[in-house]
Amino acid sequence: MQYLSVAEVAKKWNVSERSVRNYCAQGRVPEAFLKGKIWYIPENAEKPERSNKKEQPVTLLDVLQDEKANRYAGGIYHKTQIELTYNSNHMEGSRLTHDQTRYIFETNTIGIEKEVLNVDDVIETANHFRCIDSIIDCAKTTLTEKFIKELHLILKNGTSDSRKEWFAVGNYKKLPNEVGGMETALPEEVAGEMKKLLAAYNSKEEKSLEDILDFHVKFERIHPFQDGNGRVGRLILFKECLKYHIVPFIIEDDLKLFYYRGLKEWNNEKGYLTDTCLTAQDRYCLLYTSPSPRDGATS
């Protein structure tokens, strides 16, 4: 049998000499052997096929995790942080503008001279960024009471609420509350209701958009925390959509009233909330998925 050198094979295969050595060292060239520091390669050896480590399609979650890890500016992760934080906080009364929210995310500073800002708005904005990081990191994990409480703890940490004796940061409410004029679960009922809700939800191996929305409606009706339920609920929505390869969405200001109507009318007409969220999904696809620097990403 005739043998060729690494240089000869590299020229024949149109690859670098380093690639040829790697193929040989990995055992991918039959009957090639090393003598001293020299590889002897059969003259009839064929070039190994390139292995493709990323056979699975790149998902939105992959992109978010990659851009988060690499602190990529201007991509899907960057825009999701700003849009989800601004809109979700704005729904709950935050007076920070979109530009102020963006400035805090991008610079971790506040560039305001004459305007008076609510300190809690600033703290909760910074905390919400961390919440989004958490749902991206933990997107594939099973939804649990512990994780939900951790989201609330992150969101409310360092706020004026956290200094109130009756306000349980990272734990279920101590006092009765309401949402939209509707009664919610009493404090003594919350733990049991949350366990039942999660058990029923997690009993299904795969979740549809309707399953995730149904959980969201029931979560908001329990209203387990003293405050912050809407934001925690919408963070859970986003996480679960990522987990089950459903396009996530952000409820913007012009969809807010339709969203609230959908929550209220869910038992009678699921279409109100579903259609609102489908509209929000279309916007997310249009604004984020298409312009992403990572072509080929799927939900």
Task: Give the location of each predicted region.
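FIC/Doc superfamily catalytic core
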Residues: 2-13, 17-22, 26-29, 34-290
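Single conserved hydrophobic/aromatic residue that forms the stacking wall/gate
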Residues: 288-299
